């Protein structure tokens, strides 16, 4: 039940950007995720250390975390509900015109951000249509005051459109998992 702060790369060489959907609902207790834009697995050259510093400062000094929740709907709509006012809310998106591969080594630093405004008090929402060809990955990032110079940064899970894959997932039989 310890608080969790997951830091994921948008351009990871080993994990797909929307991998959160395979484990997020199973995590118990307080949980936050941040996708670090334009990063590879190492996250070198990003502000990830600042994010850890702000998170650690809040935990050590018993500072209340921002009250928010998020949802990624099947139709691609990403919605953030925030009871505390964020300092900034950004839509991050990247496109690969050829494949569902968002590794930084393939698409470079392709993620761009656009500020989002509330659609009603404390609610931010976005839905991107699938491109005519290729794929688009997108998510919302929220920054909140942390009590130090570096903000607390959290994000939603990443949505990839169109939501299709080249191969179907088949879970291994239970007997294979019992080893």
Model-predicted regions and their roles:
Residues 132-147:
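Short, aromatic- and glycine-rich surface loops/edge beta-strands on solvent-exposed regions
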Residues 6-8:
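Short beta-strand/loop motif that positions the catalytic acidic residue
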Residues 147-179:
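Short beta-strand elements
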Residues 87-94, 100, 137-140:
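Beta-strand-rich binding/interaction modules
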Residues 27-43:
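Catalytic histidine neighborhood in serine/cysteine hydrolases
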Residues 47, 53-93, 109-121, 127:
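Surface beta-strand/loop "capping" patches
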Residues 11-15, 41-42:
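Acidic catalytic loop of the alpha/beta-hydrolase fold
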